[in-house]
């Protein structure tokens, strides 16, 4: 898009430019294997595999669906995108939503984080409760 994109504000659960030590390590490893930056599909796959691994560990290797679901409820961990919890009621992800603005950093246009909202639950399910 070029400089016309400067100032555009977006909202997402992930951008490879998110500033954290864990994300920097994730981006470096991802680039080494795939020769490109990760996106929200990449981080979703990474976190999904983390959840499966942790649930299997918690069940002692039991692969029964009910045991794995019970193990996943309420699970929390630090992801490259930030803190994540699995809602014990809905089993949905509770996560930070980041607001980014396109800025020129050196000679690159990057999404620079300008704000965030922590512990965001599925807004539709939250409204349906009331």
Q: Which residues are covered by each model-predicted region?
A:
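Extracytosolic ligand-binding ectodomains
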Residues: 1-130
């Amino acid at each position: 898009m070029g400089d016309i994109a400067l100032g555009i504000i977006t909202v997402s659960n992930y951008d490879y430019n998110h500033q954290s030590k864990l994300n920097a390590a994730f981006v470096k490893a991802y680039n080494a294997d795939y020769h490109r930056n990760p996106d929200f599909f990449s981080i979703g796959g990474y976190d999904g595999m983390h959840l499966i691994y942790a649930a299997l560990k918690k069940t002692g290797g039991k692969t029964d669906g009910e045991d794995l679901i019970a193990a996943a409820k309420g699970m929390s961990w630090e992801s490259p995108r930030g803190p994540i919890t699995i809602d014990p009621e809905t089993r949905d992800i509770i996560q930070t939503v980041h607001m980014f603005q396109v800025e020129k950093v050196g000679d690159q246009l990057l999404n620079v984080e300008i704000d965030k909202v922590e512990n965001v639950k599925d807004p539709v399910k939250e409204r349906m409760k009331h």
